Design a protein with these regions (language model features):
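Catalytic-pocket segment enriched in acidic/His residues
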Residues: 17-39, 55, 61-63, 123, ...
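Short amphipathic alpha-helical "recognition" segments used for binding
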Residues: 8-9, 16, 100-102, 182
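N-terminal amphipathic/basic-hydrophobic helices that include classical n-h-c signal peptides
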Residues: 1-19
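Extended, compositionally biased flexible segments
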Residues: 17-120
């Protein structure tokens, strides 16, 4: 029997596909929702590049640049508390603490003023990045998808339903209890409402989309055997450890 996540996914399929026998099981990536038995079925993961001024500066970029976007596959999600295998083809895996916005109502060309009505809730996240692969791709002016969109590269905590989060909420990242990143949500160059407005001008957002809203300054490496914990005031943490 199909579980609730798969039933919800099937309900969103085109009518002609609903009774189709597929060669493989339909993927059903999802995230836990605080206080609910239902889970948040994930459709897509969008990420915002350079959305904190100090982080842009530490990589030599102009913090006034408009927001730009890239994707991670939905099945890159891993829940908080997971022990991960260290990723292949990298010697410089970096943490990036991020606020995650969960979209509950879709739309295209959403205005900043109406953006909150499209939000389901918020979560803590970690946009894991193979920094050496990213640097190499950038130096050759090639796409850097494989530095971001790899297996188990999106650690996401439990989603807390809500329409807004305080700009004074702190966002922090610790590696083995050493504080690496420490900022406030209000330090974003482009606030959540403007991120949603900009992204929805490129693509129609849909229920189930997640938006990782950028990381503050202080990104750095996480080695084999180390643990990494991201905290945002008022939200459950997103924590993982790389096995030895």
């Amino acid at each position: 029997m199909l579980n609730k996540e798969r039933l919800a996914l099937v309900a969103n399929l085109p009518h002609q596909w609903r009774m189709t026998n597929f060669m493989f099981p339909i993927p059903a990536p999802s995230v836990e929702i605080s206080g609910r038995t239902e889970r948040f079925a994930v459709r897509r993961i969008f990420c915002v590049g350079r959305n904190y001024a100090e982080h842009a500066k530490e990589f030599g970029n102009d913090e006034r640049d408009p927001p730009f976007f890239f994707n991670k596959p939905a099945d890159a999600i891993v829940p908080s508390g997971t022990v991960l295998a260290y990723p292949s083809l990298t010697q410089d895996l970096h943490h990036e603490a991020e606020l995650v916005v969960a979209i509950g109502v879709g739309g295209r060309n959403i205005t900043a003023e109406s953006a909150a009505s499209h939000i389901f809730g918020f979560a803590t996240g970690n946009d894991l990045t193979r920094r050496d692969l990213q640097a190499d791709a950038k130096s050759q002016r090639r796409p850097w998808d494989m530095s971001k969109a790899f297996d188990e590269s999106a650690v996401i905590g439990t989603i807390v339903p809500g329409k807004s989060i305080s700009p004074d909420a702190a966002i922090r990242c610790h590696v083995d209890e050493q504080l690496r990143q420490n900022a406030k949500i209000g330090d974003m160059t482009w606030p959540i409402s403007e991120v949603i407005a900009a992204l929805s001008s490129y693509v129609a957002l849909a229920a189930g989309d997640l938006i990782m809203t950028g990381t503050p300054a202080g990104v750095g490496p996480v080695a084999q055997g180390q643990s990494c914990r991201v905290e945002i005031d008022g939200l459950p943490e997103a924590e993982f450890r790389y096995g030895v």
